[in-house]
Amino acid sequence: MKNLLDLEHKLNYYFNDRNLLKNALLHKSLGNERKEYKNQTNERLELLGDAVLDLIVAEYLYKSYKNASEGPIAKLKAMIVSEPILAKISRQIGVGKFLMLSRGEVMSGGRNRESILADSFEAILGAVYIDSNLDEARVFALSHIKQYIDHIEENEDILDFKSILQEYVQKEFKTVPTYELVAERGPDHMKEFEIQVIVGNYKEKAVARNKKKAEQLSAKALCIKLGVKYNEAL
């Protein structure tokens, strides 16, 4: 087995009880192959780590998106804690070469299998939680997953910008935004809609494949123009 200190460097976490890290890396295939490892596999730590990760990510999103409803937050959370993302984190760390697998699992490519890598990251997080506390586990998890949260945030619609804009405009301008269809372009199966939102002398346009999306995009653009603070982390 590779030097665990090397892995701790990459994890940026040093265990008080390194046996926890060993257990987090011990796959059930080896437990099935060798009886002495049967009760030391990472499945229990994986279960715990899964719950800890759910809490950490849900808490982060709750604090970061004050104006988002439950639905978009749940969608974003599911994407962040998904198997492909967790496997990518494990690959980036290099977890695969430290895994304790059965010979058959090694021969079949287990060190690079997405499901095994994702489960292993959850098991390591569970081990960090047991070895320290929730605060340390939170720092550990976010240090590895934050870049993926940022990437997903940039490419997903999380906030209801129409509601945010309306709330702001009612408070500051004592009116409500109006939306108008500027143009429709393209054939029926690839139609695009250009929508303009108007608040007094302020106007912004956006184009999308459906009217609701175009309205959201135009509202977002006007929020930015007006300096609306719609995504403040606590």
Curated annotation (Swiss-Prot):
Asked if the keyword Cytoplasm belongs to this entry, the reply reads yes
Q: What is catalysed by this protein?
A: Endonucleolytic cleavage to 5'-phosphomonoester
Q: Which GO terms describe its biological process?
A: mRNA processing; regulation of gene expression; RNA processing; rRNA processing; tRNA processing
Cofactors, names only: Mg(2+)
> Is Transport one of the keywords UniProt gives this record?
no
Instruction: Cite the GO molecular-function annotations of the record.
Output: double-stranded RNA binding; metal ion binding; ribonuclease III activity; rRNA binding
- Residues involved in Mg(2+) binding: E46, D119, E122
Question: InterPro entries given for it?
Answer: dsRBD_dom (IPR014720), RNase_III (IPR011907), RNase_III_dom (IPR000999), RNase_III_sf (IPR036389)
> RNase III domain: from which residue to which, for each copy?
4-133
Highest taxon in the source lineage: Bacteria
- HAMAP family attached here? RNase_III
Role summary: Digests double-stranded RNA. Involved in the processing of primary rRNA transcript to yield the immediate precursors to the large and small rRNAs (23S and 16S). Processes some mRNAs, and tRNAs when they are encoded in the rRNA operon. Processes pre-crRNA and tracrRNA of type II CRISPR loci if present in the organism.
Describe the family membership recorded for this protein in Swiss-Prot or TrEMBL: Belongs to the ribonuclease III family.
Its protein name is Ribonuclease 3
Q: Which organism is it from?
A: Fusobacterium nucleatum subsp. nucleatum (strain ATCC 25586 / DSM 15643 / BCRC 10681 / CIP 101130 / JCM 8532 / KCTC 2640 / LMG 13131 / VPI 4355)
Traced from the root, the source organism's taxonomic lineage reads:
Bacteria, Fusobacteriati, Fusobacteriota, Fusobacteriia, Fusobacteriales
